[in-house]
Amino acid sequence: MTSQPMRDQVEDHLLTPKNSALLIIDYQPPQVSSIVSMDHRTLVANIVAVARLAKLYALPIVLSTVNVKASGSPPTIHQLTEVLAGIEELDRTTINAWEDEEFVTAVKATGRKKLIMTALWTEACLSFPALDALREGYEVYPVVDAVVGRGAWHWRPL
């Protein structure tokens, strides 16, 4: 039996370390503490595991916060920043990360069209940029074990 030829990791239709990027949006203390659809410790463990895997596979990572500079909201939870040491947090003032020029520029700079997307909350901070990215020709893959909303209905957009 002959093996199939090695797949091109950049052009492959499946996710590979060479064709995908991880987007982490708004994992800040107020957002984490407001969720009711998942245990907080489970959520934090899951997003940290996703970040560790992304680092292990050398995926480009875009890390974003909302209103840290504008209104003094706390930055990304320390459990994530410890794993993502050296990755700059891009702070925005809009709910939809895709409406922030610096965020979109960072995503485009990865050169990847497959976006593994995580965000708090599903119903806004995940859904809005995911829909905009899809409209611009990106493929979006939400990590359902690391995204949550403010209510049990957060699963509907997924």
Where are these regions (language model features)?
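A contiguous pocket-lining binding segment that forms or flanks enzyme active sites
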Residues: 113-158
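Active-site acidic carboxylates
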Residues: 1-94, 142, 156-157
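Short, catalytically relevant binding-site loops at active-site mouths
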Residues: 68-70, 95-98, 122-124, 148-149
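Glycine-rich oxoanion-binding loops at beta->alpha junctions
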Residues: 89-111
